[in-house]
Amino acid sequence: MTVISQVILQADDELRYPSSGELKSISDFLQTGVQRTRIVATLAENEKKIVQEATKQLWQKRPDFIAPGGNAYGERQRALCIRDFGWYLRLITYGVLAGDIEPIEKIGIIGVREMYNSLGVPVPGMVEAINSLKKASLDLLSSEDAAAAAPYFDYIIQAMS
């Protein structure tokens, strides 16, 4: 839920107008809007490049994943892994756009460890995959934009760890 929605709901629950502190938090949120949309646009426009680079980094670091017996061995398994990279990147853009982890949490992070465990996917491998996705993504952003986007990647990494 965005800062604006939170402030409105809380003020309404308490039958009052938003406080000056709440209005400041809305103002701060709006001031970062251009940056957040710029980050999302860059990530969305470069999804294919980011996913390719993240995949390359992961396979170089962990060739055992694509070797016989590895979780990404074979065309089908590899395609599923690549699909997940795109899915997580999209999920991160939702969080960046909202300026909040709630979309990440609600749409895709709750129960992720259990899901991967039930599918036999090693969660530490997924953490490595998200780290590769983070590096490939942040490398395309300015240092200021990378600093703003990094916590959303870190949230997913932490939730999986």
UniProtKB/Swiss-Prot annotation:
Pfam families (UniProt xref): Phycobilisome
Report the domain of life of the source organism. Bacteria
Post-translationally, this protein is described as follows, namely: Contains one covalently linked phycocyanobilin chromophore. The chromophore is added by phycocyanobilin lyase CpcS 1.
N4-methylasparagine: modified positions: 71
Q: Where does (2R,3E)-phycocyanobilin bind?
A: 81
Main subcellular location of this protein, as a coarse class? membrane
Location relative to the cell? Cellular thylakoid membrane
Keyword list, A-Z: Antenna complex, Bile pigment, Chromophore, Electron transport, Membrane, Methylation, Photosynthesis, Phycobilisome, Thylakoid, Transport
Gene Ontology CC terms, in alphabetical order: phycobilisome; plasma membrane-derived thylakoid membrane
Record PANTHER family: ALLOPHYCOCYANIN ALPHA CHAIN, PHYCOBILISOME 32.1 KDA LINKER POLYPEPTIDE, PHYCOCYANIN-ASSOCIATED, ROD 2-RELATED
Name of this chain's protein: Allophycocyanin subunit alpha-B
Gene of this entry: apcD
